[in-house]
């Protein structure tokens, strides 16, 4: 394909897991002629530029001459049951089960809607946090990216800035600048994309964040009064089914059909949809309290240093 004045070849790059990741590799005219003949260039699809427009039900690859970088999902909603997905959502969201369904429904039907930063914490093992992240990846495909803590600190962000979901399996962003950047990203509507060797460009930013951590006290800095986080303490799973993820994948079409028919249990009450009172949890309060205690200790140490030098 040609986008603007640049040729790209779409390739399927093998992954360690056995699957493939679709990538666009910059190509050139001479190589194209060598591989396919001099007349092939005239048949190459041509676009004026890139755009990023999320839509899961009425997806369009080309929009007014622009190539949509948002990827279509693989699943078509169809009637069926989803007992394993239901059990996973209930396990993750517990007494906030209906809010959890609302969250997933908004992701699917209203991908531009801002949503809280979902933070799943537990010091225990085998809690299903990673399984939930892999389930989201299975539903939304290439529109989900797994980031590391360092990715948030890098100036280059072109590989994740246009995604629906940015997930981190072991988050530890306990520096003030990390926390401020994460909060700003969760509410901004536009963002500067930067890639190596290319000029910065501004795009619409609609990504949501799902973070997991084994640290229940200070995975990120959250101040008192902060309303952008939804923190859930996750308990261990009662059983360990090695085929659970595959069972989840098989139920995705039925679950998506359910989401298209379900009526939301909440109405939009904030920029992140939910009334902050609904997503305030004891797990969130624990992090806020731990952060306050840490600040008090740092201030006390600072005062002691000052007094010792007087």
Which residue stretches match the model-derived regions?
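P-loop NTPase catalytic core of nucleic-acid-dependent motor ATPases
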Residues: 56-167, 171, 179, 230-232, ...
């Amino acid at each position: 394909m040609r986008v603007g004045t640049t040729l790209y070849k779409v390739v399927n790059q093998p992954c360690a897991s056995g699957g493939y990741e679709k990538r666009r590799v910059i190509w050139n005219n001479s190589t194209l002629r060598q591989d396919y003949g001099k007349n092939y260039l005239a048949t190459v699809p041509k676009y004026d530029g890139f755009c990023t427009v999320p839509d899961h039900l009425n997806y369009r690859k080309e929009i007014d001459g622009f190539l949509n970088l948002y990827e279509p999902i693989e699943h078509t909603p169809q009637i069926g049951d989803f007992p394993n997905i239901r059990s996973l959502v209930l396990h993750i969201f517990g007494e906030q089960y209906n809010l959890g369904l609302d969250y997933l429904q908004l992701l699917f039907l209203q991908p531009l809607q801002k949503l809280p930063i979902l933070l799943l914490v537990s010091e225990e093992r085998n809690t299903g946090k990673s399984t939930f992240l892999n389930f989201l990846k299975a539903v939304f495909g290439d529109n989900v990216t797994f980031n590391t803590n360092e990715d948030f600190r890098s100036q280059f962000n072109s590989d994740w800035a246009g995604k629906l979901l940015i997930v981190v399996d072991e988050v530890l962003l306990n520096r003030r600048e990390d926390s401020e950047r994460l909060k700003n990203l969760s509410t901004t509507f536009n963002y500067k994309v930067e890639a190596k060797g290319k000029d910065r460009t501004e795009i619409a930013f609609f990504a949501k964040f799902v973070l997991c951590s084994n640290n229940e006290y200070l995975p990120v800095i959250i101040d008192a009064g902060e309303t952008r986080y939804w923190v859930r303490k996750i308990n261990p799973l009662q059983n360990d089914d090695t085929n659970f993820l595959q069972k989840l994948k098989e139920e995705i079409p039925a679950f998506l059909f359910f989401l298209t028919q379900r009526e939301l249990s909440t109405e939009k009450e904030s920029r992140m949809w939910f009334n902050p009172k609904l997503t305030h949890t004891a797990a969130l309060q624990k992090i806020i309290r731990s952060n306050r205690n840490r600040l008090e200790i740092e201030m006390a140490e600072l005062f002691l240093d000052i007094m010792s030098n007087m």
